[in-house]
């Protein structure tokens, strides 16, 4: 499709969901409670797991964290990548002790939607050269 700016958006441009999908993506990417840097690190981590070539093209995770809160967020993603939704109770407690409820919700929503986008890109065999 010619609708959209990126190759990913152009694939979705064939469907009526493009606008809503893109709005959700833009809203979740905006910095609200979590920094843009930690969100980008999470995106890069998930891209390696999801085998989306298009998503992986932006680079590997950097492994650089600004503060303890960001380290906890990244640690959660590492656990999530290994066990999926079976996050141990201790990890959830650590999140609750160090992040606000709003930060936890934003973190989980960002992880979930980013994971979904990248799996879609992998299923569609989207490549950076497309």
Question: Where do the protein language model's features map onto the residues?
Answer:
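Hydrophobic alpha-helical segments
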Residues: 1-130
């Amino acid at each position: 499709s010619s609708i959209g700016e990126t190759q990913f958006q152009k694939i979705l441009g064939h469907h009526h969901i493009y606008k809503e999908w893109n709005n959700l993506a833009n809203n979740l990417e905006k910095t609200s409670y979590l920094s843009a840097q930690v969100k980008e690190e999470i995106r890069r981590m998930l891209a390696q797991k999801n085998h989306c070539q298009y998503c992986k093209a932006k680079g590997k995770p950097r492994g650089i964290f600004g503060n303890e809160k960001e380290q906890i967020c990244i640690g959660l993603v590492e656990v999530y990548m290994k066990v999926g939704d079976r996050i141990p109770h201790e990890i959830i407690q650590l999140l609750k002790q160090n992040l606000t409820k709003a930060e936890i919700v934003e973190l989980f929503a960002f992880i979930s939607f980013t994971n979904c986008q990248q799996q879609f890109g992998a299923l569609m065999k989207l490549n950076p050269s497309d």
